């Protein structure tokens, strides 16, 4: 692991890595932090390491984020401990610049913001919630995050959902400034009590930590009220009152704000069409804590992942039929794109030409119940199952531009919920907030046998079981090791081995699991 405190040193090192044949320029992940690393940061680091060749952790206590009377001087500084933490977790590079390196002449000056060019985000995003009591906070966040993205030039940058307002502002910043980076948000990591993990938790006594867990308990109570009364007039006002009432049972918590907003635009909501953010801030003693939870007013999403030959496609279709959900065959979308590239004569490895094709293609599902796949007006339902497409789809699917446009289309399909989708990174990347995530697997022998039967049923009899096994092993290696969104099991996915189980048995298992989940109980009655 390398530690750099200057931009020159960091840039020199990263440029050397980019120029090495074995290091691709699209595999750098950045985890921006202010130090005092904890389990929440660990989840970001692990995600970055899984999805990138090089992981960079920045440690910078940003003075622009602190108001004159806030705890800049007292904010925990433990670089040596953080270095050990990062090295243990396999981080490749730490970037720990000084304020002067980041362009601030005097970090402790009250006019620090006037000493450097700053980034100003839309006022409607910064003037509510945390922005009311911290008017310069998000300007400071946006400025330093922009600097870090320009310095490191990562492919992916990782942020926690706990700082939901910050996350929305950064996503908008990246979009508005056309910055070439993918913003990845990761779920909130909590103590056993439900308290969201934060660097500021170390200011709390054990008793205060237990008392502070009422923040999350109140949010959960609000969500429960929402799910049970979604069609009631003025339901959001009812939810807010319920949260405040629950919070009042712990009088040491002093509420600063409670808001229900759109998680992307941060605009206050009067009703929830698809999804809303229930966000809270409160003080316990002198320590300010924030937390949030999502309120969904849509049919559920089920994400089913797993390796090739695990039986995902057939099972997913049947689960959709059983629960009245639309089957979104994302694998077929990638196959359709691969077929299009092969038909065009463009080499599948020519990423620029592939990008030209994919950025202009339109995929649709005509007669979803019959799984007809159409690309640019042509039905390719049968053609995309050929061996040629199968042997090339991982190469095409791993390309950043392909994945960007396919994920964008998939998320548009899922905006209103009511779908079940299968693939290799559906739960981890495409629909990270899916109500239920399943990871289907099976032994290599079983997967190969199934694939051989499928090929023979399609008239492809000139292939042996050994050849199929080799193809599946090769496919697994490509899917697991691809640099962009590799095959991986989400930490909150339920794993099901399909060896020795019939298709019907696997389907019923998933349906039963769905019906017993929290969201399933509240949603399934509207579907079945």
UniProtKB/Swiss-Prot annotation:
Pfam families named in the record: Cytidylate_kin, Pantoate_ligase
UniProt record, GO biological process: nucleobase-containing small molecule interconversion; pantothenate biosynthetic process; pyrimidine nucleotide metabolic process
Active site as annotated: 41
Disulfide-bonded cysteines: none
Keyword hit for RNA-binding: no
Phylogenetic placement of the source organism: Bacteria, Bacillati, Cyanobacteriota, Cyanophyceae, Oscillatoriophycideae
Gene Ontology cellular-component terms listed: cytosol
Residue ranges, annotated region (Cytidylate kinase): 294-528
Sequence segments annotated as region (Pantoate--beta-alanine ligase): 1-293
Record-listed (R)-pantoate binding positions: 65, 166
Domain of life of the source: Bacteria
Pathway info: Cofactor biosynthesis; (R)-pantothenate biosynthesis; (R)-pantothenate from (R)-pantoate and beta-alanine: step 1/1
Purpose: Catalyzes the condensation of pantoate with beta-alanine in an ATP-dependent reaction via a pantoyl-adenylate intermediate.
Positions of ATP binding: 34-41, 160-163, 189, 197-200
UniProt binding sites for beta-alanine: 65
UniProt similarity note: In the N-terminal section; belongs to the pantothenate synthetase family. In the C-terminal section; belongs to the cytidylate kinase family. Type 1 subfamily.
Keywords recorded for this protein, A-Z: ATP-binding, Cytoplasm, Kinase, Ligase, Multifunctional enzyme, Nucleotide-binding, Pantothenate biosynthesis, Transferase
Protein name per its UniProtKB record: Bifunctional pantoate ligase/cytidylate kinase
EC number of this enzyme: 6.3.2.1, 2.7.4.25
PANTHER family per record: CYTIDYLATE KINASE, CYTIDYLATE KINASE/PANTOATE-BETA-ALANINE LIGASE
Location(s) in or outside the cell: Cytoplasm
Alphabetized HAMAP family for the sequence: Cytidyl_kinase_type1, PanC, PanCY
